[in-house]
Amino acid sequence: MSADSEFDATDYIQHHLTNLRLDLTEGTIDSEATGFWTLHIDTLIMSFGLGALFCYVFWLAARQATPGVPGGLQNFVEAMIEFIDKTVKETFHAKSKVIAPLALTIFCWVFLSNLMDLVPIDMVPSIMMAVGVDYWKILPSVDLNFTFGLSLSVLALIIIYGVMGQGVGGWLKSWVTHPLGPWLAPANLILNIVEFIAKPVSLSLRLFGNLYAAELVFILISLLPWWIQWALGTPWAIFHILVVPLQAFIFMMLTVVYLAMAYEEH
């Protein structure tokens, strides 16, 4: 490959992995903007749009639900709800009307976000460039802001359910008495701080890393001649069909496990 083609390939890869960014301090679109006051417009629109799609599908299923023979959509939604509810009850043993709906929301939202990775790599960016938008990432899971946002929300819930299950005093006490006993309070505190930080970091990086790698492979395959693209892209897409729900399930399952540990820990 020549130097020019290498530059073109690098430019192509960077283009597909760059967000549409709004610099709030300047009020301008800047693809190189970074910092706290920078919004990734494409991630926000795609994630909220997919969340709205999930809500609409379930609302439609509820509206069309009948006591007689259920339709295909109703069957699908009921099967998913029963599966999530059973999974949650096997992990979170306390009574809660929130955990199962929360788990269902996380699974469906992350699943739909991951599913965007199966959309043809150039289709949406080409459409957006045709209407004057230079950058557009359709895959929210390949944005650390999205994955860390989800994991930090889970972290907040861990604190809330820890206090609900143990009380404020019991939750604070567990930081210095668990797991090595009160005589090793400093060591307990250090271990618990590390574990507390590791939970959201591992949740977010696991989801981001798997989907980023998959997206990068799709981009690299798209740089090859068309006849090689089909030979390599098809089996990779088939394999990725398994990865998409698996990563959503892992994120959901770990969330429920962390909440159960926080609520039931003594």
UniProtKB/Swiss-Prot annotation:
Keywords: ATP synthesis, Cell inner membrane, Cell membrane, CF(0), Hydrogen ion transport, Ion transport, Membrane, Transmembrane, Transmembrane helix, Transport. Pfam families: ATP-synt_A. PROSITE patterns: ATPASE_A (PS00449). The keyword Cell membrane applies. It is a multi-pass membrane protein. InterPro entries: ATP_syn_F0_a_bact/chloroplast (IPR045082), ATP_synth_F0_asu (IPR000568), ATP_synth_F0_asu_AS (IPR023011), F0_ATP_A_sf (IPR035908). GO terms for biological process: proton motive force-driven plasma membrane ATP synthesis. It comes from the Bacteria. One of its GO terms (molecular function) is proton-transporting ATP synthase activity, rotational mechanism. Disulfide bonds: none annotated. One of its GO terms (cellular component) is proton-transporting ATP synthase complex. The chain crosses the membrane at residues 41-61, 98-118, 119-139, 152-172, 178-198, 216-236, 237-257. It is found in: Cell inner membrane. Key component of the proton channel; it plays a direct role in the translocation of protons across the membrane. F-type ATPases have 2 components, CF(1) - the catalytic core - and CF(0) - the membrane proton channel. CF(1) has five subunits: alpha(3), beta(3), gamma(1), delta(1), epsilon(1). CF(0) has three main subunits: a(1), b(2) and c(9-12). The alpha and beta chains form an alternating ring which encloses part of the gamma chain. CF(1) is attached to CF(0) by a central stalk formed by the gamma and epsilon chains, while a peripheral stalk is formed by the delta and b chains. Belongs to the ATPase A chain family. This is ATP synthase subunit a. It comes from Halorhodospira halophila (strain DSM 244 / SL1).
